[in-house]
Structures are given as C-alpha cells and as structure tokens.
Amino acid sequence: MASERKTKLSKNLLRMKFMQRGLDSETKKQLEEEERKMISDEHWYLDLPELKEKESFIVEEQSFSLCEDLLYGRMSFRGFNPEVEKLMLQMNSKNRAEAAEEDETVEVDVSDEEMARRYETLVGTIGKKFVKKRDRANYEEDENGTIKAIKPKKMFLKPQD
C-alpha cells in the first residue's frame, strides 16, 4: 500500500513560479481556490469571544479634605538631591514650621571672625598662585600669609609742562 500511494508536492512548492508552468489545469484551479479562501474576509475574522469593556471604578468624594494633607510629589532624602529637598520644604505646609525650627537650632561651626581670618589667608595663597615668576622676587610674605610688594611697581610718568 505504501508503494501505491503517490507522494504529493507541498502547496508552497506548487505555488512557486517555475512549478506553475508544468501544472495541469486541474491542479491550477485547485491552487487558485485555496488562495481565494486564504485571502477572503472570513479568513481575517477572529473567532474570539467579544471582550467586555472594562468597567471604570470611580469613587466620588463630597469634600476635598482628603487632599489637604498630601505631600509634594518629588522627594529626596539625606541630601541626595538638594534642589528637590528645597522644593519639598517649600511645598509641604507641615514642614514649613519644622524647617523654621531647624534653621534656628543649627549651630554655627565657625565664627564670623575666624571665617574672615581664613578668607584673608586664602586670598593670599591664591594670589601667590597667579603671580608671575619675575614678580615673585619683588614680593614678600608676612607671617599672616599676606603678600606685600618690596619695591613699588614702576609706572609711566607723565611729562611735566
């Protein structure tokens, strides 16, 4: 029986252009009918059950009191984003009073006088960095770190009339 059964070529192979030249009229008609079935509108219709529209879940509140104690949406903690933390402090009404209390309790690590002295020495040391080589010999450093000129810098003198 297996030897009597003739093997058939696949439909995809028969649709190829070079295979259609040698086909007889009966097989050509059969292929055309199958192609029509595939292209027909019924082929593109999905046999799925109709989907029900999702019911929206809406809750109506009579008052807006629930929205009064909400926090500002953008958040930052432990100085991760300082700009956002500033916005948080401004926008959150509860934190305004707390922020004022925190500002009052902040201790000053460096006094104003000490900061002024540090700034003076800093100006001197940074000034040294930008002095040219030939001018370094003309300047003298005090014990405080300030730089003073040994000789006054020569300047252009106007001729007298």
UniProtKB/Swiss-Prot annotation:
GO terms for biological process: maturation of 5.8S rRNA. The modification Phosphoserine is found at residue 111. A motif (Nuclear localization signal) lies at residues 117-134. This is M-phase phosphoprotein 6. Coiled coil: none annotated. RNA-binding protein that associates with the RNA exosome complex. Involved in the 3'-processing of the 7S pre-RNA to the mature 5.8S rRNA and plays a role in recruiting the RNA exosome complex to pre-rRNA; this function may include C1D. PANTHER family: M-PHASE PHOSPHOPROTEIN 6. Keywords: Cytoplasm, Isopeptide bond, Nucleus, Phosphoprotein, RNA-binding, rRNA processing, Ubl conjugation. There is a cross-link at residues 37, 86, 128, 151, 154 (Glycyl lysine isopeptide (Lys-Gly) (interchain with G-Cter in SUMO2)). The gene is Mphosph6. One of its GO terms (molecular function) is RNA binding. It comes from the Eukaryota. It comes from Mus musculus (Mouse). Associates with the RNA exosome complex, mediated by EXOSC3. Interacts with ARHGAP18. Interacts with exosome cofactors EXOSC10 and MTREX. It is found in: Nucleus, Nucleolus; Cytoplasm. GO terms for cellular component: cytosol; exosome (RNase complex); nuclear exosome (RNase complex); nucleolus; nucleoplasm. Belongs to the MPP6 family. Phosphorylated in M (mitotic) phase. Its main location: nucleus. Transmembrane segments: none annotated.
